[in-house]
Amino acid sequence: MMARAAKSKPLRDVAELTKAQAKVELMRLALELEGHDKRYYQDDAPTVTDAEYDALRQRFNAIEKRFPEFVSAESPSQKVGAAPSGRFRKVRHAVPMLSLDNAFAEEDVRDFVGRIVRFLKLDDDKIDFSAEPKIDGLSMSLRYEGGELVTAATRGDGAEGEDVTANIRTLEDVPQKLKGRNVPDICEVRGEVYMTKKAFLALNERQKAAGDTIFANPRNSAAGSLRQKDPTITASRPLGFFAYAWGEMSAMPEETQTGMIHWFERCGFKTNPLTRLCHSVEELIAFHQRIEEERAELDYDIDGVVYKVDRIDWQERLGFVSRTPRWGIAHKFPAEQAMTVLRDIEIQVGRTGSFTPVGKLEPVGVGGVIVQNVTLHNEDYIKGIGNKGEVLREGRDIRIGDTVVIQRAGDVIPQVVDVVLDKRPKTAKEFHFPKTCPCPLHTDVTREETAAGEEGSRARCTGEFACPYQKIEHLKLFVSRRAFDIDGLGEKQLQYFFDEGFVKEPADIFTLEKRNAKLKLEEIEGYGATSVRNLFAAIESRRRIALERFVYALGMRHVGETTALALARGYGSWEAFHDACLKVAKGDEEAMADMDALDQIGDTVIKSIADYFGESHNRGIVERLTKEVEIVDAEKPKSNSAVAGKTVVFTGSLEKMTRDEAKATAERLGAKVSGSVSKKTDLVVAGPGAGSKLAEANKHGVKVLTEDEWLKLIGE
């Protein structure tokens, strides 16, 4: 919800952020990223450039690195893409389609290689990597059974995509039947659907002549062409496909990444001819520099270079961290900049009440995307002060009317990197934060204190559920794709229902049909009987929901998708989770210890849950909601291993694998890895130097294994 305000203050560097400021900014950035993910992955209509988006993720990751205790699932580091749009049948990926972490400087690449060397406990950095241009297109997974194409699905949110099989069959680059020998019975080939620059220009000429929509860039045109209900439209569009990865495979035909690339070619796929095998960090960086120099001459858009560990067995050992693999990284190209005029500054009130100043720009093209909004972070940032009190932009403040330099290096909404003082008009106005919330209630504004007890730069509305801006943001999260995923209740419809008083809390959505005799929604302009019936049907179809989605939909601070999933798997059922939450809210030490023992759950999340369920208003909302829906128990780990579903603790020194590798292996086999021992712990793997955790295991009678016994148990 946007509202105009007056003057304002600037933003701080990550190194200067206090814990309180970091917590607030992480939540704000997470919400921004969610909106941009939806516009990019679902709507094929991004409002920011890739560089701007990357900058946002950079800042978010930097804050999380400095404050690891604040890592939550709402962080961009915990998410992949966006949930399927609902226009196509949903397809669950047998192997998740995760995204790569980003590198923006040579030092990032060196750190990436160093982490791999340490993880694998290698004596040197002599590792082979495949290197290839990062195509700016639409990720696709093609499933073949018995050599025949059976399903084509988009990335979606990484776990679930959209079925676009009929459309994919129209692409010449996608074989209907795989060629060659040693083709596995089940084979998922992954790659990128793209459109060449030449084809993009020709398509836009035809669109313009026909009076149809003009696409912003080749990526949007490729995505829009593929996600057509009518396959003949897709067939008329010149789309290409590069194969570069795989998902579920009943057998691996090759032992290396580059070997798989050649195997794809033998099967009938096109692969990027610029792919190379590199043997050192220096070769990786040299390849990046060469591709950047050749970038303008290529007939397709790229936004960086991808590096992957070549040995597949090493990829499997390295595994994943949340949403990204340890064995791969995308080395992005430098950001692009442009100058434009800052026309106004508006205050955005987030779901948690935090104020974010958003600059409204004279529209300007940056890297092929029209940019109209820019995040100004907080008061200090606007004043030219960084997070640690350092000077930004040589002390130049930002005023309404200024000519500013914006950069699309990664901020979801681009960032202002400078102000052109020579162009500052006499009418330029300083911006000051409002003293009250811009909502109709004009509730008071509070400031989060710094670690030194001083007033911070982050402003927050104190109205909480009384503030209509916060209420509506909670409802938007509730109906979002990652939560209840209710079709027909978009932002505009939900805002209308909220303004009219039809929906004030989540349970109201499920009682709309009962109340419609009085509300008469079909008489509202733009609705009609058919639209209302469809809406009620969509709502009815969402009365049954998975536990992890329900927990996420509650909108508790610091409980995003990843955390919600960890809680759901930890407790199994709503009854068990709800009971634990009520006990935690009352300060029950045993309940808090049990929750703390869950993977990815720490003090910050526990406090947030305690605060939420300690508030009677929230308990009432939950009670009314649970009367309207059925909450499905969490799925059990899909693994036949001896440790599936067990809670494991590693302690002491491990000699045959790193601690990270041991944790990744256990989780891959369906186990839960905890950092502390409790009576609910199933196994403790103890190496030399094991101390208090081993003592706790003996105290609780928990089974203790040596490293060799652990490896034998898991069959490695």
Swiss-Prot record:
Record-linked SUPFAM superfamilies: BRCT domain (SSF52113), DNA ligase/mRNA capping enzyme, catalytic domain (SSF56091), Nucleic acid-binding proteins (SSF50249), RuvA domain 2-like (SSF47781)
Give the source's domain of life in one word: Bacteria
Keywords of the record: DNA damage, DNA repair, DNA replication, Ligase, Magnesium, Manganese, Metal-binding, NAD, Zinc
Where, in this chain's numbering, is NAD(+) bound? D50, A51, E52, Y53, D54, S99, L100, E132, R155, E192, K308, K332
Q: Does the keyword Ligase apply?
A: yes
Cofactors, names only: Mg(2+); Mn(2+)
Q: Which residues form the BRCT domain?
A: 638-716
Q: Which InterPro entries match?
A: BRCT_dom, BRCT_dom_sf, DisA/LigA_HHH, DNA_ligase, DNA_ligase_AS, DNAligase_adenylation, DNAligase_N, NA-bd_OB-fold
Q: Which Pfam families match?
A: BRCT, DNA_ligase_aden, DNA_ligase_OB, HHH_2
User: Per its UniProt entry, what is the enzyme's top EC class, as one word?
Assistant: ligase
Q: Which GO terms describe its cellular component?
A: cytosol
Reactions this protein catalyses = NAD(+) + (deoxyribonucleotide)n-3'-hydroxyl + 5'-phospho-(deoxyribonucleotide)m = (deoxyribonucleotide)n+m + AMP + beta-nicotinamide D-nucleotide
This entry's Gene Ontology molecular function terms read: DNA ligase (NAD+) activity; metal ion binding
Task: List the catalytic residues.
Answer: K134 (n6-amp-lysine intermediate)
The cross-references to PROSITE patterns, in alphabetical order and at most eight, read:
BRCT, DNA_LIGASE_N1
Q: Which family does it belong to?
A: Belongs to the NAD-dependent DNA ligase family. LigA subfamily.
Protein name per its UniProtKB record? DNA ligase
Organism, as annotated:
Bradyrhizobium diazoefficiens (strain JCM 10833 / BCRC 13528 / IAM 13628 / NBRC 14792 / USDA 110)
